[in-house]
From Swiss-Prot:
Keywords: Oxidoreductase, tRNA processing
Biological processes annotated in GO: tRNA modification
Entry GO MF terms: oxidoreductase activity, acting on paired donors, with incorporation or reduction of molecular oxygen
Active site: C184 (cysteine persulfide intermediate)
Disulphide linkage map: none
Protein name (Swiss-Prot/TrEMBL): tRNA uridine(34) hydroxylase
């Protein structure tokens, strides 16, 4: 199948005047050329992933590079056979990356233009992975790590990125005096997180420049030492990184078998991302727990128009019943 669609991943921390109006104008331009994607605009900068054919994406890159302060913006490009998005969204937010510092009564937010970790090339990052005296931290959400991660990287005991600062403070003694390098998908989260670590007093903090997306495309490292796939926030869900010796590290939520297929829990009030096969999705009604399986608004049940008798039958097959006590 021909790969005639390009997916552009990018970000830039740069002051944007009248960012709300900028977002509205940006959306109008994107729609005028038929671009699809999701873009966040804030006073501190821009962060987006978009897709379209070659002509459309080229028009977009030319347009962005014509904007004041964005002449050198770095686009990371994937070639795909299908669109990565169905619609076009451009939204104004307070921040393009929310680290949650103010939410947790920490210090003020980080400005990466003033404070950030040292940039590491893919080659330098690979060397750091092989250095036993270097601590490698994954700064992404838990479900991103579970699908794929760098070999030997620490998985913080957190659900999402915003919990990372508190986790680091709780585990400070483990790596305060060591070299620490961090990584994320495209680099935008690491700019802030590494800067926060510098401000916390860590003396030697590095970040993978361009993120995992760049590491996988580098002709020298070719994604080596990455295990599994990289989670992406578009229709693709998962993309390859390691082109040397790829492996599967994802495990099915229900039986632990190798799996790289993500779905959202059928309970809309849970919505946890879980790895599971189509067979187990059907078997467990796409519910990550008994409570979610029997929830009255379970989306899997409603989508498949299952009768109560059919739900009871499937629950019985896994040793559960409608009226049993919830186990979560």
């Amino acid at each position: 199948m021909a790969k005639d669609i390009r997916v552009l991943l990018y970000y830039l921390y740069t002051p944007i005047e009248n960012a709300e109006q900028f977002a509205a104008d940006h959306l109008a331009f994107c729609k005028s050329i038929g671009l699809k994607g999701r873009i966040l605009v804030a006073d501190e900068g821009i962060n987006g992933t978009v897709s379209g054919d070659y002509e459309t994406t080229q028009k977009y890159m030319d347009y962005v590079h014509s904007l004041p302060g964005m002449e050198e913006l770095w686009f990371k490009i994937d070639e795909e056979s299908e669109q990565a998005f169905k619609k076009m969204f451009v939204r104004y937010k307070k921040e393009i990356v929310h680290l949650g510092l103010e939410d947790n009564d920490f210090d003020n937010d980080i400005n990466p233009l003033e404070t950030t970790g040292a940039y590491l090339s893919p080659k330098e990052f690979k060397e750091a992975l092989l250095d036993k005296d270097t601590v490698v931290l994954d700064t992404r959400n838990d479900y991103e790590y579970d699908l794929g991660h760098f070999r030997g990287a620490i998985r913080p005991d957190i659900r999402n990125f915003r919990e990372x600062p508190q986790w680091v403070r709780d585990n400070k003694e483990k790596f305060m005096d060591k070299r620490v390098v961090v990584y994320c998908t495209g680099g935008v989260r690491c700019e802030k997180f590494s800067g926060w670590m510098v401000r916390e007093g860590y003396k030697d903090v590095g970040q993978l420049h361009g993120g995992i997306a760049t590491y996988g495309k580098d002709p020298e490292v070719q994604g080596e030492l990455w295990d599994g796939k990289m989670y992406v926030f578009d229709e693709r869900i998962a993309v390859d990184v390691n082109h040397v010796n790829p492996t599967i590290v994802g495990k099915d939520w229900f039986d632990g078998t190798p799996c790289e297929r993500y779905v959202n829990c059928g309970n809309p009030f849970c919505n946890r991302r879980i790895l599971t096969s189509e067979e187990n999705e059907d078997k467990y009604l796409r519910g990550c727990s008994h409570e979610c399986r029997v929830h009255p608004r379970n989306r899997y049940v409603s989508k498949n128009e299952l009768t109560q008798a059919e739900v009871i039958e499937r629950l019985a097959a896994i040793g559960e019943s409608l009226d049993q006590a919830a186990t979560v």
